[in-house]
Amino acid sequence: MSGFFITATDTEVGKTVVAGALAGVFRELGYNIGVYKALQSGHVASNPEGDAARLKVLSGVPTKEDEICPYSIEEPLAPRLAMKRAGRAVTLKDIIHHYNERLKEFNSLFVEGAGGLAVPYTEDALVIDFAKELQLPLIVVARPTLGTVNHTVLTIAYAKANGLTVAGVILSGCKECEMERVQENKVMIEELSGVPVLGLLPFFEGEFTKEEVLESAKEYIMISKLEEFIRNESTVAHTSSN
């Protein structure tokens, strides 16, 4: 298996934009990459305002929204609670099954979690349990300003304590007027966690196009570093199968 698990330090930090943009960029580079978000609350999968629809648009995958996200519900709560309140039972086994179905279509998947790693996800698992099953390297999406050092370092420590590899951090929503503080936070995160900050993605104000997002990702994220992970994972997978 290859790809990335995109998590964050909080909700509404920019995971979907980052996941969709990275998948779109790698697809432009010729990689057969898909996107997967097992559970979505706040919108049903077909809603154009929801994460599944935005992942589809940004990545450019042919996959239907309800295959990108097989379990979705409108109530904006932690997925486990939202599903429970709706009388729906979703297990870790269920979402791994759908993950494996997507792998029949793509060589690699960029998987988006929900909120942070300790979010109650399925009825029997947290987000981190799902990440541990997949064993994909993590990309941590974080806010760029006040409080982000603490949140990001804690997230990385929690991931490492659970045996996960963290490929890097992307600070999302960076404004030009705050860049001095953003750069200081970048340096502190790297020093305290030992994990590189691979990008400072700008703040997108108002409506934005797929092209604008992908061009920003190419300009502000170290795509070549992430490409090394994809290549290394593919090499390991090929070697293991021989």
From Swiss-Prot:
GO terms for biological process: biotin biosynthetic process. It is found in: Cytoplasm. It catalyses: (7R,8S)-7,8-diammoniononanoate + CO2 + ATP = (4R,5S)-dethiobiotin + ADP + phosphate + 3 H(+). Substrate binds at S41. InterPro entries: DTB_synth_BioD, P-loop_NTPase. Mg(2+) binds at T16, D51, E112. Pathway: Cofactor biosynthesis; biotin biosynthesis; biotin from 7,8-diaminononanoate: step 1/2. GO terms for molecular function: ATP binding; dethiobiotin synthase activity; magnesium ion binding. Pfam families: AAA_26. ATP binds at E12, V13, G14, K15, T16, V17, D51, E112, G113, A114, G115. The active site is at K37. Keywords: ATP-binding, Biotin biosynthesis, Cytoplasm, Ligase, Magnesium, Metal-binding, Nucleotide-binding. CDD domains: DTBS. One of its GO terms (cellular component) is cytosol. NCBIfam families: bioD (TIGR00347). Catalyzes a mechanistically unusual reaction, the ATP-dependent insertion of CO2 between the N7 and N8 nitrogen atoms of 7,8-diaminopelargonic acid (DAPA, also called 7,8-diammoniononanoate) to form a ureido ring. This is ATP-dependent dethiobiotin synthetase BioD. It comes from Bacillus thuringiensis subsp. konkukian (strain 97-27). The lineage of its organism: Bacteria, Bacillati, Bacillota, Bacilli, Bacillales.
